[in-house]
Amino acid sequence: MYRKSTLAMLIALLTSAASAHAQTDISTIEARLNALEKRLQ
């Protein structure tokens, strides 16, 4: 159960991470997302 602010933060984080890494390390980004989701549950 996410709040809109949390979703916005995740989207911003993903966007910045994707541009920073130029999609060279998608698995690391996914791992970070999974860790964040576990923390938020």
UniProtKB/Swiss-Prot annotation:
Entry membrane topology:
Multi-pass membrane protein
Keyword Cell cycle among UniProt keywords: no
Q: Where would you say this protein principally sits, based on its record?
A: membrane
State the Pfam families in the record: Sugarporin_N
- Classification via InterPro entries: LamB-type_porin_N_dom (IPR021570)
The UniProt record lists the keyword Membrane: yes
Question: What Gene Ontology molecular-function terms does this entry list?
Answer: porin activity
Where does it live in the cell?
Cell outer membrane
The positions making up the signal sequence are 1-22
Ordered alphabetically, the record's keywords are:
Cell outer membrane, Ion transport, Membrane, Plasmid, Porin, Signal, Sugar transport, Transmembrane, Transmembrane beta strand, Transport
Q: Name one GO biological process term.
A: monoatomic ion transport
Gene Ontology terms: cellular component: cell outer membrane; pore complex
What is the documented function of this protein? Porin for sucrose uptake.
Q: What's said on domains?
A: The C-terminus helps to anchor the porin to the outer membrane.
Query: Could you say which protein family the record assigns here?
Result: Belongs to the porin LamB (TC 1.B.3) family.
Subunit details: Homotrimer.
Question: What is the protein name for this chain?
Answer: Sucrose porin
- From which source organism is this entry? Salmonella thompson
Gene name of the record: scrY
